[in-house]
Amino acid sequence: SVLKREIYDLGYDISKVEDGKVTFIGDADAIARANIFLRTAERVLLKVGEFKATTFTELFDNTKELEWEEFIPKNGKFWVTKANSINSKLFSSSDIQSIVKKAIVERLKVKYAVNWFEEDGNSYPIRVSLMKDVVTISLDTSGDSLHKRGYRPAAGKAPISETLAAALIMLTPWKS
């Protein structure tokens, strides 16, 4: 894939390639560099955990077991921005979002010894993906999609997205 080549060009090794997703291992610098330099990615996600869940109880318990305190500070503002489910027993996006948020709150209540979160600090958007009963929970490090990089605050309708256009150009022999 074009994105795979872009990641290699940044100096990172690919650990997995799937439909619509390329996984690589890197540090905090890699996250920043990926958000700045990847032209064909829609967003850069930091995987917090992956586990199997066929019931909402399993989803809650496994989410609560993840070390959220490593990623979200005591005053962090967090919410589940998106949940999607494909070929999984758990399919209600709103229920998945609610249960994941509740599990994170319960974990952080214990770790930070508080009963209430002000959530007045930095934002930590969370994305949940279920594929064949395997849950992947990630922090969204990009915020808005990467095709909205600030150079054009209001984009008009286009026949293709900027990231797809970048990929098509990268597949041609043309060099800037």
Locations of regions flagged by a protein language model:
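Non-catalytic nucleic-acid substrate-recognition regions in nucleic-acid-modifying enzymes
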Residues: 1-124
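Glycine-rich adenosyl-nucleotide cofactor-binding module
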Residues: 130-176
